[in-house]
Swiss-Prot record:
GO molecular function, one term: transmembrane signaling receptor activity
Topological region Cytoplasmic: 225-232
A single cellular component GO annotation: cell surface
InterPro entries the record matches: Ig-like_dom, Ig-like_dom_sf, Ig-like_fold, Ig_sub, Ig_V-set
Membrane topology, Extracellular segments: 21-203
The species this protein was found in: Bos taurus (Bovine)
Gene: TREM1
Keywords assigned: Adaptive immunity, Cell membrane, Disulfide bond, Glycoprotein, Immunity, Immunoglobulin domain, Innate immunity, Membrane, Receptor, Signal, Transmembrane, Transmembrane helix
Residues modified by glycosylation: 192
Signal sequence, start to end: 1-20
Name of this chain's protein: Triggering receptor expressed on myeloid cells 1
Broad class of where this protein is predominantly found: membrane
Source organism phylogeny: Eukaryota, Metazoa, Chordata, Craniata, Vertebrata
Residue stretches making up the Ig-like V-type domain: 21-125
Chain segments annotated as transmembrane: 204-224
Compartment(s) where it occurs, according to its Swiss-Prot or TrEMBL record: Cell membrane
Length: 232
């Protein structure tokens, strides 16, 4: 109960602050006689879709005059005042046609409730001037006071080019000499080979020396045997 009372008090203070701020700021609109005032008041669809909405005039003596009320209908016309409640757009459209100088004053659009009304938009200070030509002014450029519900800005997505995949380095084993020799299609060309020049007479001298040595040994042996036989 205490929490509910606190929240209720805070809500009342919040509403009073909004109303005080709304009374400070005014939208001024100057029109000539015969023209039409058009005002768009944003509403909260989730909260006030079924609430009564009204167009009021604030007199100089502080009196509030209710000019038109949406009595369960989306469109209401009372004399020169036309109200259209559009819950799907969260907007209350108001028109005052065939303006006269005596229509000059301060106006506001509100939500009617059990207590004080909830102000939907800044009060509009309407100033109606005499038409110098004496004929009704054209409605081609009526004064429009409106506030559109904030809409999210479009999000622009920039497509970035996808980076190309880099080729992965392939590690190959270093071929050995045996692999080079055994691999087909390779020709082995020996390099840095020292050429040895062989003398052609070596193959003849060595056998001749061996034969001469053996003959010399035989001759020495025969000489020793002969010398021993003569000595005896």
């Amino acid at each position: 109960m205490r929490k509910a009372g606190v929240w209720g008090l805070l809500w009342m203070l919040f509403i009073e602050e909004i109303q005080a701020a709304a009374e400070v700021f005014e939208e001024k609109c100057t029109l000539a006689e015969g023209q039409t005032l058009k005002v768009s008041c944003p509403t909260n669809t989730n909260i006030y879709s079924n609430s009564q909405k009204a167009w009021q005039r604030l007199k100089d003596n502080g009196e509030v005059q209710t000019l038109a009320i949406t009595e369960g209908s989306s469109q209401v016309r009372v004399g020169k005042y036309f109200l259209e409640d559009i819950p799907s757009e969260g907007m209350l459209q108001i028109q005052m046609a065939n303006l006269q100088v005596e229509d000059s004053g301060l106006y506001r659009c509100v939500i009617l409730g059990p207590s004080d009304p909830i102000i939907l938009f800044h009060p509009v200070r309407l100033v109606v001037t005499k038409n110098s030509l004496g004929t009704p002014a054209s409605d081609e450029y009526p004064c429009q006071v409106s506030v559109q519900n904030p809409t999210p800005l479009p999000v622009t997505t920039k497509l970035r080019p996808r980076p190309r995949p880099r080729p992965k380095p392939v590690t190959q084993p270093i071929p050995t000499s045996a692999d080079r020799l055994s691999s087909p299609g390779f020709t082995v060309t020996p390099t840095n080979v020292t050429h040895v020049n062989r003398a052609p007479g070596i193959s003849i001298i060595i056998p001749a020396a061996c034969g001469l040595l053996s003959k010399t040994l035989v001759f020495i042996g025969l000489f020793a045997v002969t010398h021993r036989s003569f000595a005896s």
